[in-house]
């Protein structure tokens, strides 16, 4: 079953201020309230003559709250339970805020709807969640902080198959606007072979699923059940085609040495044939 990684794509290490401390001294962190009240100052560390490194990172409660809403809403959309992972035992204030805000949003805005759908929400420590991901069969949404989502999305994709099987969906907090794309890059090496007229065995699955995810959302917005059913059928056909032994080179290599594989065109034709058979059935 799929593992959906929800990545909070704001702040933390990705908007941090870091620098090399050149020598002996003290690094302080200061909060200056906008209302003119007394500043709050905290010591980060004392450095010896050899210096070191320091980093200051941040996030906003509003952004965390929006991420919680997007994660829980997408969990309902996909009919999956939702898990949030943090290290709140160490970062009691920073990660603790993620835990507290998610719980608040869940209880106040989503619990009744998720209960009615038989879905759950739970917070877990990141190390526990990573271990669970290794042994569970999938079928859940894993909400991650920015760095964790960056790393774990690739771990899940490669560990359970191939980057060519991972689709990325960007969603606004209100759930109305999405952008779906293949999570991998442009596969330039294969394109150069294609330009030379050579056959390639490039995995198109992530690109196909990017279209199906986008079209499924269009169907949801328009109340077009026929379109939603088509996207679901196409996704199922792609999976069944691979399970029947027809696949591209990257997947064949995972099955075992000497496993036969198809070219890009042959694989696309196999999917088209199977889809036509499904639609006409």
Feature map (PLM): residue ranges:
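N-terminal glycine-rich phosphate/adenylate-binding segment common to multiple enzyme folds
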Residues: 1-40, 53, 147, 151
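A glycine- and small-aliphatic-rich helix-loop capping segment at beta-alpha/alpha-beta transitions
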Residues: 19-27, 98-105, 159-169
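Glycine-rich phosphate/diphosphate-binding loop of Rossmann-like nucleotide-binding domains
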Residues: 31-124
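Short glycine/threonine-rich loop-to-helix capping motif typified by GTGT followed
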Residues: 92-103, 133-140, 147, 157, ...
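Glycine-rich oxoanion-binding loops at beta->alpha junctions
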Residues: 126-133
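Glycine-rich phosphate/nucleotide-binding loop
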Residues: 133-233, 240-244
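Internal helix-turn-beta structural module
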Residues: 196-202, 220-281
């Amino acid at each position: 079953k799929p593992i959906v990684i929800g990545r909070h794509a704001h702040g933390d290490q990705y908007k941090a201020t870091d620098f090399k401390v050149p020598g002996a001294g003290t690094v302080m962190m200061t909060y200056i309230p906008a209302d003119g009240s007394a500043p709050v100052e905290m010591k980060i560390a004392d450095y010896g003559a050899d210096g070191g490194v320091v980093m200051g990172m941040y996030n906003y409660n509003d952004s965390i709250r929006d991420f919680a809403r997007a994660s829980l809403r997408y969990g309902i959309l996909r009919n999956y339970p939702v898990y949030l992972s943090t290290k709140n035992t160490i970062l009691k204030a920073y990660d603790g805020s993620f835990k507290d805000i998610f719980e608040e949003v869940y209880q106040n805005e989503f619990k009744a709807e998720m209960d009615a759908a038989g879905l759950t929400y739970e917070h877990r420590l990141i190390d526990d969640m990573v271990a669970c991901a290794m042994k569970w069969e999938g079928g859940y949404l894993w909400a991650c902080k920015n760095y964790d989502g960056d790393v774990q999305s690739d771990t899940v994709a490669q560990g359970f198959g191939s980057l060519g099987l991972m689709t990325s969906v960007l969603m606004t907090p209100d759930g109305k606007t999405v952008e779906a794309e293949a999570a991998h890059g442009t596969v330039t090496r294969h394109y150069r072979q294609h330009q030379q007229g050579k056959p390639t065995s490039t995995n198109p699955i992530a690109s196909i699923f990017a279209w199906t995810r986008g079209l499924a959302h269009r169907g949801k917005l328009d109340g077009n059940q026929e379109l939603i059913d088509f996207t679901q059928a196409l996704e199922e056909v792609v999976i069944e085609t691979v399970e029947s032994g027809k696949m591209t080179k990257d997947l064949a290599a995972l099955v075992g040495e000497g496993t036969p594989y198809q070219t890009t065109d042959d694989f696309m034709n196999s999917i088209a044939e199977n889809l036509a058979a499904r639609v006409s059935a």
